[in-house]
């Protein structure tokens, strides 16, 4: 696939940060979880740096206990370098999501017995300014083939993990999950996105997320609090 202006650079962390991603899947993915939590695509200071969905550096290293070699994209944006474990910036969305998981479940093992976190699209799209451009804002001629490939990949993930339900983190992820899984019978719902671009999340994402989980039929019994 090729992507034109306003996109100037495309990163695929599954290539240059393959080792941490493989550790994440091998250590934490299991069949039959209560819910697959589905994000959209990598953020420039999260998965783009670590290879882990919502991969805020500190959370990945200190709570998930994942490390490993991280390379660089073949064509790196000068304003969005991949510094890997040395990235000084903290992704707010990842800090909120993994911070909630830590405080609610205590250990990764307890959390991943119930959930798994993945992204719908593995690619990060950057404009010349360094601004992140999400897949839904790509031109239709580029977007449609991308979505078709990501839909197929999502069906493969769901087939492998057999989650009881898929919860899109944000409306776009929910919509894509509904479209991709329409023929499978897997229930699809949503969680509010923890991004600071979501004003409601800035007023308190955790209670919103837990309300959405319960509404989707996910019990939080057995969590620490």
Annotate the PLM regions:
Residues 1-165, 174-175, 189, 199, ...:
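A polyanion-binding, active-site-adjacent surface
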Residues 171, 194:
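Active-site metal-binding loops of divalent metal-dependent hydrolases
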Residues 177-184:
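Short, aromatic/basic amphipathic alpha-helical patches
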Residues 184-193:
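Short hydrophobic/aromatic-enriched beta-strand-loop microsegments
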């Amino acid at each position: 696939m090729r992507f034109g202006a306003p996109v100037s650079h495309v990163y695929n962390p599954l290539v240059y940060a393959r080792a941490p991603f493989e550790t994440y899947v091998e250590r934490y993915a299991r069949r039959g979880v209560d819910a697959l939590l589905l994000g959209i695509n990598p953020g420039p200071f999260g998965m783009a740096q670590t290879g882990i969905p919502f991969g805020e550096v500190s959370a990945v290293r200190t709570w998930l206990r994942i490390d490993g070699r991280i390379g660089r994209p073949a064509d790196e944006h000068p304003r969005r370098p991949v510094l890997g474990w040395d990235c000084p910036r903290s992704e707010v969305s990842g800090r909120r999501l993994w911070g909630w998981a830590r405080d609610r479940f205590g250990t990764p093992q307890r959390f991943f017995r119930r959930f798994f976190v993945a992204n719908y699209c593995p690619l990060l799209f950057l404009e010349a300014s360094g601004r992140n451009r999400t897949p839904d804002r790509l031109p239709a001629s580029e977007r449609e083939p991308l979505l078709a490939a990501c839909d197929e990949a999502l069906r493969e993930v769901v087939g492998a993990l057999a989650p009881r339900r898929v919860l899109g983190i944000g409306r776009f992820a929910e919509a894509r999950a509904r479209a991709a899984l329409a023929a499978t019978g897997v229930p699809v719902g949503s969680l509010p996105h923890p991004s600071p671009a979501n004003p409601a999340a800035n007023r308190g994402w955790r209670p919103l997320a837990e309300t959405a989980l319960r509404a989707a039929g996910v019990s939080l019994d057995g969590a620490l609090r």
